[in-house]
Regions:
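N-terminal subdomain of nucleotide-sugar transferases
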Residues: 7-81, 186, 251, 256-257
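Conserved donor-binding/catalytic core segment of Leloir-type glycosyltransferases
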Residues: 20, 227-244, 249-253, 264
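Carbohydrate-associated surface elements
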Residues: 60, 193, 212
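Acidic anion/phosphate-binding donor-loop and adjacent secondary structure
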Residues: 69-70, 200, 212-231, 245
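Membrane-proximal helix-turn-helix segments that form the acceptor-binding/catalytic region
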Residues: 106-110, 128-131, 135-139, 152-153, ...
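Nucleotide-sugar-dependent
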Residues: 244, 294-301, 308-330, 337-349
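Nucleotide-activated donor-binding/catalytic signature segment of Leloir-type glycosyltransferases, i.e.
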Residues: 273-299
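A charged, aromatic-enriched C-terminal amphipathic alpha-helix characteristic of glycosyltransferases
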Residues: 360-365, 371-404
């Protein structure tokens, strides 16, 4: 190591590498995107060290209008700078999401204008964060590393009901998708179920780093003994959207299971009104709806439950996905009740013990399996070891840094 006056010239020779990190959700927000990207950015910062700077461009917490938490607009932590774009208030409707992303898109371009970067990393579930990454990377003529958490074109093709709008929107989305994915240097697919869909994009190299288990769930798994009051509690926590299809399963299952089972639904989202309407239509009284809670409060809710619930709607697009929620629920020794199809169904069957598994929206199958189930608790230590978020993030950060 040079010493004295030569040290100044030595520092000039060191080239600091700059990474632009794009993610719509980041801590302290409550969402799968936030839980994935917050620890990954920290691991990237750690491995990059003093010769690497990371610019995170994200949003103020906005996942749920019913959950408010303060966060700094600009935050500097070591070699990482976090820029949070303030978004208009919304209720999670389609047009609300369009307006929110338009604001994020334009502000991100302003924040990054004139700055030098060596790599753009973009974590995207709705395609447009990936597209934002493409726009910036192409303008600056630098590599683009994408982390793809959903196949947005597939999802919109399934969810959108208006045929005229769909006929205009889907070709437009496919054009954006083609440009974005063909430009990318590398694409990480969060689910191996996406692999066949992406086989048409030949330019990038691929990895398959999944979601993982956060330490908060491993270290605070208290596992209290049931009080044996005769009523089983089934808890769902997360988004209440069209994608989860809770309005197609929980009211009907609650009616079929009867008073011996109590559902707790913790969360918010665009399809909550449909869930409420269906509960009222069926006159169901054994379902409790609660607002979103912090992760520490969620731990308490999980620990006081008997079953932990996961469900996706019966759309073809969802046969390729692997919901992040399974990594959260399987850390507890409680039985998991999962209504999923396709790749997620196979993944859970092969990796998660003590699970009540059924096809999406199949009320009769769920009710029958619940009634025939002999209650037990099972530790899933091998699953926890295999899918630790820390281990996955270390490998993924190394992969990202290899493109500098």
């Amino acid at each position: 190591m040079p010493s004295g006056n030569l040290y100044f010239f030595y520092e000039l020779l060191i080239v600091k590498m700059n990474i632009l990190y794009l993610t719509f959700y980041f801590e302290p927000d409550l969402s799968a995107g936030s839980f994935r990207n917050s620890p990954l950015a920290k691991e990237l910062s750690k491995q990059g060290g003093e010769n690497c700077h990371i610019d995170v461009v994200t949003t103020q917490p906005n996942r749920y209008s019913s959950f408010k938490v303060e966060a700094k607009e600009r935050e500097d932590v070591g070699n990482m700078s976090i820029h949070r774009v303030d978004l208009p208030s919304h209720k999670s409707g389609m047009m609300d999401q369009v307006r929110s992303f338009r604001k994020y898109f334009t502000e991100a371009l302003k924040i990054t204008k004139g700055k030098h970067y060596d790599l753009v990393f973009a974590s995207s579930s709705r395609l447009f964060t990936a597209y934002l990454g493409y726009v910036i990377a192409r303008r600056k003529r630098i590599p683009l590393y994408l982390d793809i958490r959903d196949i947005f074109v597939d999802t919109m093709n399934n969810v959108m009901k208006n045929k005229f709008i769909k006929s205009l929107l889907i070709p437009f989305l496919k054009l954006i998708e083609k440009r974005t994915f063909n430009y990318a240097t590398h694409i990480n697919l969060i689910s191996a179920g996406f692999k066949p869909y992406f086989s048409k994009f030949k330019s990038p190299s691929y990895t398959y780093f999944t979601n993982g288990i956060d330490d908060i769930f491993i270290g605070n798994n208290l596992q209290p003994i049931r009080d044996n009051d005769g009523v089983f509690t089934i808890t769902y926590a997360g988004n209440i959207g069209e994608g989860q299809g809770l309005h197609k399963i929980i009211p009907q299952a609650a009616a079929g299971l009867g008073s011996g089972y109590q559902f707790k639904v913790i969360g918010d989202g665009g399809a909550k009104s449909m869930l409420v309407a269906e509960l009222e239509r069926l006159g169901v009284s054994n379902v409790e709806l609660l607002h979103p809670v912090s992760r520490n409060e969620l731990l308490e809710q999980y620990n006081n439950s008997d079953f932990l619930f996961l469900h996706l709607n019966d759309y073809e697009a969802f046969e390729k996905v692997l919901p992040s929620k399974i990594f959260e629920l399987a850390t507890f020794n409680k039985p998991v009740v999962a209504g999923v199809g396709g790749y997620a169904n196979r993944f859970i069957y092969e990796n998660v013990d003590n699970v009540i598994l059924f096809q999406p929206c199949d009320v009769d199958s769920m009710v029958a399996k619940m009634k025939n189930y002999e209650y037990k608790n099972v530790e899933r230590q091998e699953f926890i070891r295999k899918f630790s978020r820390d281990n996955i993030n270390q490998d993924m950060a190394r992969s990202i840094l290899s493109y500098l």
